[in-house]
Amino acid sequence: MDMQQAIRAVTQRIDLSEQEMTAVMGLIMNGEATPAQMGGFLVGLAMKGETVDEVTAAARVMRDLATRVEVQAGHLVDTCGTGGDASGSFNISTASALVVAAAGGRVAKHGNRSVSSKSGSADVLEAAGVNLDLSPEQVARCIEQVGVGFLFAPKHHGAMKHAVGPRREMGVRTLFNVLGPLTNPAGAPNQVLGVFSNRWLEPLARVLGRLGSRHVMVVHAEDGLDEISIGAPTRVAELRDGEVTVRLIAPEDFGMERADLSRIRVEDAAGSLAMIRGVLDGQPGPARDIVLLNAGAALYVADVAGSHAEGIEMAREAINSGAAAEKLQQLVSFTASC
């Protein structure tokens, strides 16, 4: 299937097979599609609605082209979300990653600089003094020795350079907004994946199942947050051993009070880092609570904790003991030595 055939199909609302989507993504990622063809296809696909087959095929192509990080899969988890929730919140998943590592998990944290948010995971880690310019081998050693490593997306997904311009110029959400969290270069089999819309909950859980993931929670909160929220109930699609179940969870299920999201908003990476340091230092409040909710979920899917509630208690202990604050310093020190 060539690009013109693909554009005709999606604009007529015809779904592509996995084989057809694989061919089209190959053209895009190898730079053989023009910017106009890429834009036309991605917008047409979005208006039709991407299927599980199409997203699975696209993610496989990206995974095959990625520069891999070779680490053992045991208790390995990613806390990468789609972003795009426009909440202005601090970097919750980045803080969670540090707490998870301090509690005994192993985190391959996939992320990038900010596109639409006040601060991306790369921005806040750089502000903390973390060196992002690591080779895949150095990232692997970081995960093994520190318990958490940052997989800076541009270093691992070089083929994405062909899509950067058209994506920026279109200014609308497309397939690429959800592909990032599906293409962890370390192949983390466990994941807490926040999405910007309920529409993606079950489909992405099923896609990750097809891609070989073991235990995943795909989450979207009723207040719009692409995390497990402290401000509202959160809908969860949980993939475990090939089965997907959907449920609603709320802060009060775990003995926490709801809080307005305005209390966790920041203006920039420096503000996000200050809030993260406060959480890691044990300051009580909604920022700490939302990190506990999300870190607890990551410890649960990584099979470090037997339940979400147990994961929250393990995360709480990692903060109270000082291990979480120490973990950030260990990450800074290790990457500085590379």
UniProtKB/Swiss-Prot annotation:
Anthranilate 1 binds at residues 81, 112. Pathway: Amino-acid biosynthesis; L-tryptophan biosynthesis; L-tryptophan from chorismate: step 2/5. One of its GO terms (molecular function) is magnesium ion binding. 5-phospho-alpha-D-ribose 1-diphosphate binds at residues 81, 84-85, 89, 91-94, 109-117, 121. GO terms for cellular component: cytosol. One of its GO terms (biological process) is L-tryptophan biosynthetic process. Anthranilate 2 binds at residue 167. Its cofactor is Mg(2+). Belongs to the anthranilate phosphoribosyltransferase family. Homodimer. This is Anthranilate phosphoribosyltransferase. It comes from Thioalkalivibrio sulfidiphilus (strain HL-EbGR7). The gene is trpD.
